[in-house]
């Protein structure tokens, strides 16, 4: 299976590493008996998803499939802190383990410090004591296969072909870039038997969380909970995904004029920009950037009338609920990473001249924004919003 790493240097390095691993593991593959995965009955399963929050959410349908296939197994999920907050009380998962992998493009938490290495070694030791029977890695990351599969002693290891990995795995699905991440995650599990599509991503909210977020909105606005509430999600972990702030301001103004209460969502790092975006606006326009936990944000979008934003985790969280979504795409491939919801309208142009598989930077920026996003006008977003009023759902 071909490696699907689109950075040429990384791809070349991976080919060399995979070739070396293939040689070293050849005797193991020859001498080892191939397990019958369709008859597997593991006592402990480790699900591995150390990506960003949108990736974890898009994998959640696979959680349902694993629980259905292995109802008596203890299922552990290894994810980051935000993933733990979202899925810590998930009935499909017995225990959530946390490790915040340092992703290089993030402004914070992007270095392997001595403390991070120490945490990693302690985690590997903990997992060795767990005696994991089955590791399921949904990212297809060679580093994760080695660290959390080989070094932890996981007896059976399955993943996809994104980074090769075949010599270290007992089963590997094809990483197909023409398919959505939800579908690819489910294909990883096909080695255990045919997979029924369990539907959309899902986040389980408690009975207390909905009334609590409604109360928070009422305290913010000083009024009863609004009948028309729009959530704006203008911020992403990568600047190349950003849509011009002035465009968002135009959309917010139009929503406000149409009687919507508008709330801008984001992290603490976005709070200053959010206040600047809404400053001087008339109507009921507010910011909760940096003022909500990820679970509060999930509750917030679940009670909204619509969510409008760029390619960000907020939209994937919104896809877990029956809320209309307007998703603004440009530098990333919507076929793979769009919000997986029948309520989602995807807006994008065909003007992207960069490598959408890398989506690291734009080589043709317009006023500091990616060209493909700068050419997508507010009028197109407002048209999609108007369509929502006529028909909130676009597909079953």
Residue ranges and their predicted role:
Residues 1-396:
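Catalytic machinery of carbohydrate-active enzymes
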């Amino acid at each position: 299976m071909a490696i699907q790493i689109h950075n040429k240097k990384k791809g070349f390095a991976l080919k060399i590493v995979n070739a070396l691993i293939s040689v070293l593991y050849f005797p193991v593959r020859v001498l080892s008996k191939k397990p019958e995965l369709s008859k597997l009955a593991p006592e402990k399963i480790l699900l591995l998803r150390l990506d960003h929050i949108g990736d974890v959410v898009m994998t959640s349908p696979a959680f349902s499939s694993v629980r259905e296939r292995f109802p008596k197994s203890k299922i552990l999920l290894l994810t980051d802190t935000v993933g733990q907050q979202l899925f810590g009380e998930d009935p499909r998962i017995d225990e959530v383990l946390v490790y915040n992998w340092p992703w290089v493009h993030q402004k914070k938490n992007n270095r392997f410090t001595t403390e991070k290495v120490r945490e990693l070694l302690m985690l590997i030791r903990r997992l060795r004591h767990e005696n994991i029977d089955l590791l399921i890695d949904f990212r297809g990351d060679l580093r994760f296969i080695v660290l959390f599969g080989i070094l932890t002693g996981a007896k059976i290891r399955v993943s996809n072909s994104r980074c090769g990995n075949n010599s270290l795995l007992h089963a590997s699905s094809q990483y197909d870039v023409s398919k959505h991440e939800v579908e690819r995650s489910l294909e990883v599990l096909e080695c255990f038997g045919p997979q029924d599509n369990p539907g959309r991503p899902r986040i389980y909210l408690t009975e207390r969380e909905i009334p609590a977020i409604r109360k928070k909105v009422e305290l913010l606005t000083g009024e009863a909970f609004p009948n028309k509430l729009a959530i704006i999600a203008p911020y992403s972990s990568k600047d190349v995904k950003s849509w011009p702030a002035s465009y968002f301001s135009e959309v917010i103004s139009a929503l406000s004029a149409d009687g919507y209460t508008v709330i801008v969502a984001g992290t603490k790092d976005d709070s200053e920009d959010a206040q600047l975006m809404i400053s001087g606006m008339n109507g009921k326009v507010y910011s909760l950037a940096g003022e909500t936990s990820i679970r509060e944000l999930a509750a917030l979008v679940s009670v909204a009338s619509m969510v409008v934003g760029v390619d960000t985790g907020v939209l994937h969280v919104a896809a877990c609920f029956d809320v209309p979504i307007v998703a603004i795409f440009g530098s990333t491939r919507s076929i793979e990473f769009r919000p997986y919801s029948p309520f989602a309208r995807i807006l994008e142009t065909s003007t992207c001249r960069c490598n959408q598989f890398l989506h690291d930077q734009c080589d043709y920026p317009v006023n500091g924004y990616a060209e493909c996003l700068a050419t997508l006008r507010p009028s197109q977003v407002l048209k999609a919003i108007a369509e929502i009023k006529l028909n909130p759902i676009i597909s079953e």
